[in-house]
C-alpha cells in the first residue's frame, strides 16, 4: 500500500510518530512542514532524523518536483497527522502553496482517500465550516480525540487509540487497542 503522510505544524507529533511506526512494510511518502519541524523540537523526544527514518521516501515541503505532487503518481491514501487548522483552511480554499497542500489537492482531484487529523481545541465557526466543506468533498476529518471506553492508563494508550482509528481508516490492520 502506498501512503502519503504529511506532518503539519499542529501539536500532536506523537500521533504522527506512532502512525509511521505502524506503517512499516508499506510504501510511505513523508513530508514534514517547516512549522512541524519546530513543533517536533518542542514536543517530541524523537528527532527529525528518526521520524524521517520511519518513511520509505522523504520530501521537503517546498519540493514541487516530488512525485506526490502529480496526479499521475498513484497512491492509496494521504493522511495529514497532525493537521493544523492553517493546513485545513488552505486545503478548503484550494491553496496549494506547499507540497503537503499540493498532495492534498491531488488527492481531492483524483478522488483518493484524504484523511486530516486536527488536534486543535476549541474550534471556531470558520474552522468547523472548513472541516464541513472538506467532509462534503470526500475528506475524512478524524479529530485526535481518544476514546475512554478502553480505559487508557497512560498518554501512550490515548495516542494508540487515535492511531489505531487512523490505521483502520487507511485499511492497515492493527491490534493497538482492545476492540469491542
Curated annotation (Swiss-Prot):
This is Flavin prenyltransferase UbiX. HAMAP family: ubiX_pad. It comes from the Archaea. Keywords: Flavoprotein, FMN, Prenyltransferase, Transferase. FMN binds at residues 9-11, 33, 84-87, 119. It catalyses: dimethylallyl phosphate + FMNH2 = prenylated FMNH2 + phosphate. One of its GO terms (molecular function) is flavin prenyltransferase activity. The gene is ubiX.
Amino acid at each position: 500500500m502506498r501512503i502519503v503522510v504529511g506532518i503539519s505544524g499542529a501539536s500532536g507529533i506523537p500521533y504522527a510518530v506512532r502512525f509511521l511506526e505502524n506503517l512499516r512494510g508499506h510504501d510511505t511518502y513523508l513530508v514534514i512542514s517547516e512549522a512541524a519541524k519546530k513543533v517536533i523540537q518542542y514536543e517530541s523526544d524523537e528527532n527529525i532524523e528518526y521520524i524521517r527514518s520511519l518513511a520509505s521516501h522523504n520530501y521537503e515541503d517546498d519540493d514541487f518536483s516530488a512525485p506526490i505532487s502529480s496526479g499521475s503518481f498513484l497512491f492509496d491514501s494521504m493522511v495529514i497527522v497532525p493537521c493544523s487548522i492553517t493546513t485545513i483552511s488552505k486545503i478548503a480554499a484550494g491553496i496549494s502553496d506547499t507540497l503537503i497542500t499540493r498532495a492534498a489537492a491531488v488527492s481531492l482531484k483524483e478522488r483518493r482517500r484524504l484523511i486530516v487529523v486536527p488536534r486543535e481545541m476549541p474550534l471556531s465557526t470558520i474552522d468547523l465550516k472548513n472541516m464541513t466543506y472538506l467532509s462534503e468533498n470526500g475528506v475524512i476529518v478524524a479529530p485526535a480525540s481518544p476514546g475512554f471506553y478502553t480505559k487508557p492508563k497512560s498518554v501512550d494508550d490515548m495516542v494508540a487509540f487515535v492511531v489505531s482509528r487512523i490505521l483502520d481508516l487507511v485499511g492497515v490492520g492493527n491490534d493497538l487497542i482492545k476492540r469491542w
